[in-house]
Amino acid sequence: MRSIIIASNSSGGGKTTVTLGLMKALVSRGLEVQGFKVGPDYIDTAFHESVTGKLSRNLDLFLMGEDGVKASFARGNGDYGIIEGVMGLYDGRGVTSEYSTAHLSKILKLPIVLVLTPKAQSLTLCAEIEGIVNFDSDINIVGVILNNISEGYYNLLRIAIEEHFKGKIKVFGYLPKNEALSLKSRHLGLVQSVEINTLNEKLEKCSELLENHVKVDELLKYFSKTSDFKDDYHLKNKNLKIAVAKDEAFNFYYKENLELLHELGEVTYFSPLKDKKLPENIDFLYIGGGYPEIFKDALSENKDMLLEIKNKLEDGTRCYAECGGLMYLMEAIEGSSMVGFFKGSSYMGKRLQNFGYAEVTVSKENRLLPLNIKINCHEFHKSYVNTEEETIYSVTKYTYLGENKSWRCGYTKKNVLAAYAHVHFFGNLDFLKHLVR
């Protein structure tokens, strides 16, 4: 599989638009495309899947470790792999480039195309590109695609870039301004792909514009084949019956996490929004993140499911819930009744409560996880819970000021663990083994 990384100088720089347009263009040519996303984001991978028709995979060096990232990449297959970067090219943890798109490009040894959205500049854009290219000589930036500009402005910038770089940086083309390409956002990023009724029309338009204004055949020459990486992330079948909540309200899952659960036994997906009962005779319940606050009324109205889950958990069924899953297990979300396994309620704040990479230390004796086990995680939420339930997590985030910010989380009761932390099992295999033992 030949692959390339689509990066930018900032968030909102056009990476997702170009990535989706390029994926759609290649799929329309009858090619098999594998999508990847740098970092922890769930929403972009869902957009990839809506185009390619196959699983898109996260590549997160902090959550998964270098070997985990290589294993995830090794699971990808197709004619071409397209990796969508995260934030600006060099933006990593704090004020370093650690875990950034640039860092990943060096691990996988893959070339980079920069997507830039210029405004009211000409030669200064060349200075910006030169600074990005020369900032780290160990990465390979092969060219640029300009985004959201007119044809006349593109021709001006193309000449400036070509004359300045003398062919060392290719100008592959541009995407013109077009309102049809915009994707709506909400408090945690883009609106989910499953909620956009006109998504197919948007993708078709994006692909059409990209084919007309970007030299796709020239770009494909720069896709590169990388090493064959090992994938040692497998578990023995324990014949477990596992239920996973999956619908419009709960769909933030890393694909590899689900694949590991499938290796452990039989996985059945159910909808907390629509189903009345859980799958029968389950040993383990997994409720991931999502947007339960958006669907709180519909979740609250499904009384049969709320009672079913509460009774199962009270009877001792093992359960792991992340972020939105934690909110769902509380008594209420913003006044709408929920499962009520944990005492207390969830509320929406006006700002992010905790954002970014953090490290969990299990700091209190409990029946699920060993004391002092450490877990890399990511948090991204505006909600908070008001509860006095027992916590076993001490969560620490290292700030760009060199200080440590710490807080408590990880609510436990009987055989249930619920927390705001999102965890990738590739970086925390022992964590998963303890949860399902």
UniProtKB/Swiss-Prot annotation:
UniProt KW Cytoplasm keyword: no
Enzyme Commission numbers on file: 6.3.5.11
Family matches, as Gene3D superfamilies: 3.40.50.880, P-loop containing nucleotide triphosphate hydrolases (3.40.50.300)
Statement: the UniProt record of this protein carries the keyword Glycosyltransferase: no
Record's keyword terms, sorted: ATP-binding, Cobalamin biosynthesis, Glutamine amidotransferase, Ligase, Magnesium, Nucleotide-binding
Example of a GO MF term: cobyrinic acid a,c-diamide synthase activity
Family: Belongs to the CobB/CbiA family.
Domain comment, as recorded: Comprises of two domains. The C-terminal domain contains the binding site for glutamine and catalyzes the hydrolysis of this substrate to glutamate and ammonia. The N-terminal domain is anticipated to bind ATP and cobyrinate and catalyzes the ultimate synthesis of the diamide product. The ammonia produced via the glutaminase domain is probably translocated to the adjacent domain via a molecular tunnel, where it reacts with an activated intermediate.
Role this protein plays: Catalyzes the ATP-dependent amidation of the two carboxylate groups at positions a and c of cobyrinate, using either L-glutamine or ammonia as the nitrogen source.
UniProt-recorded name of the protein: Cobyrinate a,c-diamide synthase
Organism: Clostridium acetobutylicum (strain ATCC 824 / DSM 792 / JCM 1419 / IAM 19013 / LMG 5710 / NBRC 13948 / NRRL B-527 / VKM B-1787 / 2291 / W)
Chain's gene name: cbiA
